[in-house]
């Protein structure tokens, strides 16, 4: 039986979505007590989640892009309760790239996404906990660094609204001649690497930045963090970018990437390093990223590629 009381937290940029409004009405007619809260400024999602927990809501639905999903998931994870006693998590994809939803096969239409939540039992899912100079942060999908992070951070909001995921490609092309390598040391259980890199992916999920499959084999229920490092190899960068164009992004990654799968990873850099945590930048010289097993429960489709069990 579907949970009877849901709270949908809607990104304020999507308040004019007529399909979502109609879908909410349909679910209410099916007997779901479905409240809607709209985010306006920083901190709203966390406050709405706290209210939902206090009110005994069964399911919290993130309606927005990857950033909204991560913000709602992080707000749930901040509560010192285990997954079984927290509200379950649902997703209605309304963002520009919808990287998590795409990789997870979550339906893109609001009614189908809400129906999935009603029909599918929530599954345990992992989250990434990132400890840095400014305290702990949480990440639901992918933490990325290097070239891809700069593309995501620099992509204009207006361009994203007009062109969707194509905006990331245009911004990336404009940066091809100015890729600056970053030096860092990486250490985890049975894994160590040191050198300069141009791209980094730390995956709970598989893709970020408008379809970049940085961690193509990652699953979100194995308690492990997938690591992909693209080194700055002398004489290879131009060839790699050529492969990116002619053979596809994945072929380029497979050509040069260093990969690992670990429960946690420490990163130390002599210069400030910015990680993009599902759209939110965090800058530090020292990071510790841990995969926290089964931190939440989430409604996902039967054929979800991100579930390994």
Curated annotation (Swiss-Prot):
Annotated GO CC locations: cytoplasm; plasma membrane
Domain of life: Bacteria
Cofactor: Mg(2+); Ca(2+)
Catalytic EC class: transferase
Active site: 280 (proton acceptor)
Record has Metal-binding as a keyword: yes
Cofactor annotation comment: Binds 1 Mg(2+) ion per subunit. Ca(2+) may be able to substitute.
EC number: 2.7.1.-
One of the GO biological process terms: phospholipid biosynthetic process
Compartments where located: Cytoplasm
UniProt-annotated binding residues for ATP: 39, 65-71, 96
InterPro entries recorded: ATP-NAD_kinase_N, Diacylglycerol/lipid_kinase, Diacylglycerol_kinase_cat_dom, Lip_kinase_YegS, Lipid_Phosphate_FormReg, NAD/diacylglycerol_kinase_sf, YegS/DAGK_C
The keyword Cytoplasm is annotated on this UniProt entry: yes
Keywords: ATP-binding, Cytoplasm, Kinase, Lipid biosynthesis, Lipid metabolism, Magnesium, Metal-binding, Nucleotide-binding, Phospholipid biosynthesis, Phospholipid metabolism, Transferase
MF terms (GO), sorted A to Z: ATP binding; lipid kinase activity; magnesium ion binding
Ligand binding (Mg(2+)): 219, 222, 224
Residue span(s) of domain DAGKc: 1-134
NCBIfam families, A to Z: lip_kinase_YegS, PRK13054.1, YegS/Rv2252/BmrU family lipid kinase
Protein's job: Probably phosphorylates lipids; the in vivo substrate is unknown.
Family membership: Belongs to the diacylglycerol/lipid kinase family. YegS lipid kinase subfamily.
Name used for this protein in its record: Probable lipid kinase YegS-like
């Amino acid at each position: 039986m579907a949970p009877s009381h849901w709270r949908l937290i809607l990104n304020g940029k999507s308040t004019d979505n007529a399909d979502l409004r109609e879908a909410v009405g349909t679910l209410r007619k099916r007997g779901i007590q479905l409240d809607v809260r709209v985010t306006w400024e920083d901190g709203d999602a966390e406050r709405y989640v706290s209210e939902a927990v206090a009110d005994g809501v069964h399911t919290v639905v993130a309606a927005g892009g990857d950033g909204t999903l991560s913000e709602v998931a992080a707000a749930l994870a901040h509560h010192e309760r285990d997954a079984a006693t927290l509200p379950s998590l649902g997703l209605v994809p309304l963002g520009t790239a919808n990287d998590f939803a795409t990789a997870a096969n979550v339906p893109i239409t609001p009614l189908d996404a809400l129906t999935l939540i009603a029909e599918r039992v929530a599954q345990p899912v992992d989250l990434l906990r990132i400890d840095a100079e400014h305290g702990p942060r949480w990440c639901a999908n992918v933490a990325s660094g290097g070239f891809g992070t700069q593309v995501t951070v620099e992509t204009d909001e207006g361009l994203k609204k007009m062109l969707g995921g194509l905006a990331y490609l245009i911004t990336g092309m404009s940066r091809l001649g100015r890729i600056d390598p970053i030096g860092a040391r990486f250490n985890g259980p049975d894994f160590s690497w040191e050198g300069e890199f141009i791209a980094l992916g730390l995956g709970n999920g598989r893709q970020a930045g408008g379809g970049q499959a940085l961690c193509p084999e990652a699953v979100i229920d194995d308690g492990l963090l997938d690591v992909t490092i693209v080194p700055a190899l002398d004489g290879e960068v131009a060839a790699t970018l050529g492969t990116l164009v002619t053979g596809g992004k994945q072929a380029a990654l497979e050509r040069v990437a260093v990969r690992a799968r670990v429960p946690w990873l420490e990163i130390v850099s002599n210069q400030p390093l910015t990680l993009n945590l599902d759209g939110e930048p965090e800058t530090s010289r020292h990071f510790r990223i841990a995969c926290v097993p089964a931190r939440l429960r989430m409604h996902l489709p039967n054929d979800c590629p991100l579930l390994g069990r």
